[in-house]
Amino acid sequence: MKKTLLSLCLLLSLLPMRLLATTEVYVVAVGVNTYKGEPGMSLNFCRQDAMKFASMMLTQTTHVTTLYDEQATRRAVYDKLKQVCSLADADDVVIFYYSGHGMPSGFCCHDIVYTQTGLTYTDMQSLFKGCKAKNKMVYADSCYSGKLRPSGRRSGSAGKKSPVMFFLSSRSNETSIEMKEKQNGVFTYYLVKGLSGAADSNHDKFITAKEIFHYVSYQVKQASRQRQHPVMWGKFADDMIVACLN
């Protein structure tokens, strides 16, 4: 239990080097503004979203891989996640972040062809099932991302089949809003702000799944005037630590 707690604390705190020898945090951050052969699908700030998330994580770990635009083909994203999952040990943390277009079963990669060649929920479940890391998290800022959630699951720590915490930017029938003034998606802006400390509602230097959900959900709903509602689901406790602050 102690080693698991320390593993999670690595997410956003600078821990002594002796811990880094046995605990690692692996991050794959993907941002797609442009889509091959689909100029009408272009977005504005998805690359910036992924850069913002990756920049935050780079202050805590060197194991951060970024894939932007034409780099983020379906094969490249899948292979990188597969590599990360194979490297992670039981006490490690694996984080996948995505910003871009969503599709009913997953996320659109750069080489998307209508609803094909995306990274699907089935792909992620298959990869994570073979991953030794006990703590796996998916953050996604994409339209209709709530469709990734199996039907009947509630927001919060719902579901008993997924070993992964999914935190998605919107419900299945909602778009995910970009903020021109911040040059970020509204979800990513408040996600990074929350993980950096703003979500620590009881000021105990630990941010739990429940705290990050409530903080981001409230801020996104306010900023979007109730047009966007983040969802969270997976097999985890409400008090699971997702960030530890100095």
Tell me what each language-model feature is.
Residues K3, L10, L15-N246:
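Cysteine endopeptidase catalytic domains of the caspase/legumain-like
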